[in-house]
């Protein structure tokens, strides 16, 4: 039997109370709202489906359409690794316990997921065939194992001889489990005959380039390495007859309970995380993919060999590993790719200008429409400024070659105190963060690994500068990671401010994190886990009390917190206009009579990944606007450290409102959630097409930030000086006898 690392019962119980709501919770008033709630997992799959359908947009360049298919497949990988893995664990623990939000048992959810996956695979097959046929007609051909062209065959043979020494075949006796295959690793699997019993052959394909490109006449031929190995499968088993050979890819569970492992390990958190990563590599499989087709016999052998139920062995003509799509981008002609819109260089500030500018104005950076450079420049300005004493920052996901990490290291080398709260548990970025923790420590930064029970997901940076009158705080509150790569792909916001209340709260957050504690009370920041959901609910209740005069607009990535959704239902019933912009998971149905008639929900799927979080409550003088790092998932409201700041600057408020208004106007990339739980694409009809992301790029490019003007010198007087009048002379002193006489006479 393979040594799959199965979580214990206590770990399963912890997993069972995650983002989908406490499965062990008793019945409550939430049962009354079941008809307006959607299942979290099926909502995730609905989001993936919207991403896939971008590949059907004929107005997009061909490679862009193919890339959307690859994004869909990558999302599905993560879904199975994270969500299906957790559901499998729960199904083992209490298979009949229903989810508190959707009312479905783990088994029912797994079955529904399997059906949805099969339907999406069929759509992906058709789209992939259409797109690759169109690319072939335009001069880019993706070769397959069953090619017949003699020139292509000769090229394949030549390339196979190059990689053949790097591949090793294995024979698996009948009835034995399959050898260990790494997560998302491909292998050729074959049914072999010629021995006593039918056996399986396996050729793992790992650590090889994803593809090879050939330029033949005017055609670019892309040969995926997996297709190449599949073509020559018989040559790995010369003493056997290969009855059937296909590509196999295994997806493994990535859900591992870290809380118990992290408890009491403050002395060496990094070593524990490295042990966790090694352990995760051997978790049980949750999905198998066979390409391009497979007999029932082979499907059964794979299911038995991997200890998988048959319904989680998927057969499809869509490539099981579309990683070659990303890798081959450099081979694709420009006319097949989208035009890259460069971020606007509209912030005229340079290093040395930021402190003086921020002393007078708040600054908003809207990514990717504007560059992230101003924030990097601010860090370098702080590093070189003699009055700066410290820089504190939370780090969750850093770029591969991070200029921000370099700036922090430079500041430490310049003698500044640099404190980095680095979250090692950022899923799938753990090793990257471990590497950066060593680099930052080597540069002289103080690295803190956050809290045992809560992930530190907040995006906060605090610069402390000593002035004659006291400490001045320069605070950055953001919605996205300090990551230059995603800053070009995700829509995010950075607010830079010298608001003293925000600075004091940020200092309180960092003091608490340094002491291994959460933040119970703040002046103005909303800080999860204690002060985020409660503040959101308070603001919703304020608008509920206003009735038809109330207004709520919320933009987040995902939402499934039942308490927040219950408050939104109450607001809708009170007549409050509720507009939600939820890109991904959304577990609330709008437009349900008696519940959510006044709730409207949109999702934008475009060139950039919508990622900023914006909360607006009220209109006019009652309006309050907040931005921050957290979604409205239970994991954000209960088990993470998040931070939101109120935006008081009128100009920046207007910019944030413009973002929401643009999303409301979008009639090309918007989807509307209906009362039955389905999504419908918004189309222009007779109106002019309006794409919010393109419009926002133009809008923020026009928001010029000029350098602060130097103080004007005191003007010299140019008018002629006025003559100064002499004071009147003192009165003349009288002789003594005259003064005596005046005294006698009473004068």
Task: Label every model-predicted segment.
Residues 2-552, 570, 574, 586-747:
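N-terminal localization/anchoring segments of enzymes in phospholipid and broader phosphate metabolism
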Residues 577-581:
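Hydrophobic alpha/beta core scaffold segments
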């Amino acid at each position: 039997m393979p040594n799959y690392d199965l979580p214990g019962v206590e770990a399963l119980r912890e997993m069972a109370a995650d983002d989908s709501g406490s499965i062990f919770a008793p019945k409550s008033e939430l049962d009354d709202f079941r008809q307006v709630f959607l299942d979290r997992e099926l909502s995730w799959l609905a989001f993936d489906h919207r991403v896939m359908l971008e590949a059907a947009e004929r107005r997009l360049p061909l490679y862009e359409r193919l890339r959307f298919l690859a994004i869909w497949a990558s999302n599905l990988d993560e879904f199975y690794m994270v969500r299906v893995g957790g559901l499998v664990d729960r199904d083992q623990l209490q298979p009949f316990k229903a989810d508190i939000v959707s009312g479905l048992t783990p088994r029912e959810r797994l079955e529904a997921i399997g059906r949805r996956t099969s339907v999406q695979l069929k759509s992906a097959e058709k789209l992939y065939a259409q797109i690759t046929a169109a690319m072939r007609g335009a001069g880019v051909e993706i070769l397959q194992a069953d090619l017949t062209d003699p020139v292509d065959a000769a090229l394949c043979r030549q390339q196979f001889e190059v990689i053949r020494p790097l591949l090793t075949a294995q024979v698996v006796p009948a009835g034995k489990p399959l050898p260990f295959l790494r997560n998302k690793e491909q292998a050729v699997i074959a049914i072999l005959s010629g021995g006593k019993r039918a056996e399986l052959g396996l050729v793992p394909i790992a650590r090889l380039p994803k593809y090879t490109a050939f330029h033949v006449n005017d055609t670019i031929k892309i040969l995926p390495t997996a297709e190449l190995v599949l073509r020559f499968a018989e040559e790995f088993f010369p003493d056997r007859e290969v009855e059937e050979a296909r590509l196999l890819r295994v997806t493994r569970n990535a859900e591992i309970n870290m809380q118990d492992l992290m408890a009491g390990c403050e002395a060496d958190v990094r070593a524990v995380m490295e042990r966790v990563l090694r352990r995760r590599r051997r978790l049980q499989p949750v999905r198998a993919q066979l390409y391009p087709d497979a007999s029932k016999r082979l499907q059964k052998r794979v299911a038995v060999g991997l200890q998988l139920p048959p319904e989680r062995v998927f057969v499809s003509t869509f490539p099981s590993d579309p990683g070659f799509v990303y890798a081959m981008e450099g081979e694709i002609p420009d006319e097949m790719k989208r035009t890259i819109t460069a971020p606007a260089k509209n912030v005229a500030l340079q290093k040395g200008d930021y402190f003086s500018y921020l002393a007078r104005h708040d600054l908003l950076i809207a990514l990717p429409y504007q560059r992230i450079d101003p924030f990097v420049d601010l860090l370098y300005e702080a590093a070189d400024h003699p009055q700066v004493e410290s820089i504190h920052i939370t780090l969750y996901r850093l770029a591969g070659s991070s200029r921000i990490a370099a700036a922090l290291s430079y500041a430490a080398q310049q003698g500044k105190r640099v404190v980095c709260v680095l979250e090692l548990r950022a899923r799938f970025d753990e090793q990257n963060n471990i590497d950066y923790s060593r680099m930052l420590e080597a540069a002289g930064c103080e690295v803190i690994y956050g809290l045992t029970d809560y992930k530190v997901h907040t995006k906060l940076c605090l610069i402390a500068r000593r002035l004659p009158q006291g400490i001045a705080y320069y605070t950055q509150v953001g919605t996205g990671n300090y990551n230059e790569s995603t800053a070009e792909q995700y829509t995010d916001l950075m607010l830079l401010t010298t608001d003293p209340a925000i600075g004091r709260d940020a200092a309180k957050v960092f003091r608490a994190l340094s002491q291994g504690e959460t933040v119970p009370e703040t002046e103005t920041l909303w800080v999860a886990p204690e002060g985020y959901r409660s503040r959101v609910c308070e603001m919703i209740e304020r608008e509920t009390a206003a009735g038809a005069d109330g207004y709520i607009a919320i933009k987040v990535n995902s939402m499934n917190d039942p308490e927040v959704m219950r408050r939104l239902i109450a607001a809708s019933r009170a007549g409050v206009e509720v507009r939600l912009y939820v890109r991904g998971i959304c577990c609330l149905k709008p437009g349900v009579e008696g519940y959510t008639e006044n709730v409207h929900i949109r999702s934008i799927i475009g060139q950039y990944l919508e990622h900023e979080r914006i909360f607006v409550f009220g209109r006019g003088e009652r309006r309050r606007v907040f931005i921050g790092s957290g979604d409205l998932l239970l994991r954000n409201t209960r088990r993470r450290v998040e931070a939101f700041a109120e935006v008081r600057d009128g100009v920046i408020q207007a910019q944030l409102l413009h973002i929401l208004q643009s999303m409301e106007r979008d009639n090309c990339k918007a989807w509307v959630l209906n009362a039955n739980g389905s999504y419908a694409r918004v189309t222009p009809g007779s109106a002019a097409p309006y794409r919010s992301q393109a419009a926002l790029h133009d809008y923020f490019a026009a928001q010029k930030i000029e350098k602060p003007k130097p103080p004007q010198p005191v003007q010299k007087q140019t008018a002629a000086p006025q003559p100064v009048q002499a004071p009147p002379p003192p009165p003349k002193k009288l002789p003594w006898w005259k003064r005596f006489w005046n005294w006698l006479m009473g004068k």
